[in-house]
UniProtKB/Swiss-Prot annotation:
InterPro entries: DHquinase_II, DHquinase_II_CS, DHquinase_II_sf. It holds the Pfam family DHquinase_II. Keywords: Amino-acid biosynthesis, Aromatic amino acid biosynthesis, Lyase. Catalyzes a trans-dehydration via an enolate intermediate. This is 3-dehydroquinate dehydratase. Homododecamer. It comes from Halalkalibacterium halodurans (strain ATCC BAA-125 / DSM 18197 / FERM 7344 / JCM 9153 / C-125). The lineage of its organism: Bacteria, Bacillati, Bacillota, Bacilli, Bacillales. Its EC number is 4.2.1.10. The keyword Nucleus does not apply. GO terms for molecular function: 3-dehydroquinate dehydratase activity.
Length: 145
């Protein structure tokens, strides 16, 4: 069974508690369960992970090469300044789609810049947890080609 790796960055372990008016009331566990079921219904496996540590995220991106069909990445605040994560994405041939629960472009100005987006297949923002499902559909559709 093909695998889609889902990587969530810093503070996403606080989903459901942290600013629910912005990020929603679903917990990270809820999100992971939802994505696992979503993938299984399409004959795929979702490998869901979260870390508050940049090095873990980099290691997982590297691990995706040759192990996963694609990566859904919510780098959290690392989006705006982690050239190390950007370079990790650029170093693999596996497609990566960047996802953000909130519309980062409608928030504080520091959130408007993504150093990671230019090396991803695409970016989905502001659609809540459905954004992850749309990213998965895009990766699965890309697999068919």
């Amino acid at each position: 069974m093909e695998t889609i790796m889902v990587i969530n960055g810093p503070n996403l372990n606080r989903l459901g508690k942290r600013e629910p008016d912005i990020y929603g009331r679903e917990t990270l566990s809820d999100l992971h369960e939802r994505l696992i079921k979503f993938a299984e219904a399409r004959g795929y496996k979702a490998d869901c992970r979260q870390s508050n540590h940049e090095g873990d995220i980099i290691d997982w991106i590297h691990e995706a090469e040759g192990r996963s069909s694609g990566v859904i990445l919510n780098p959290g605040a690392f989006t705006h300044y982690s050239y190390a994560i950007r370079d990790a994405i650029a170093s693999i041939s596996v497609p990566v789609i960047e996802v953000h629960l909130s519309n980062v472009h409608a928030r504080e100005s520091f959130r408007h810049t993504s150093v990671t987006a230019p090396v991803t297949k695409g970016q989905i923002v502001g659609l809540g947890v459905i954004g992850y499902e749309l990213a998965m559909l895009a990766l699965l559709e890309g697999e068919k080609k």
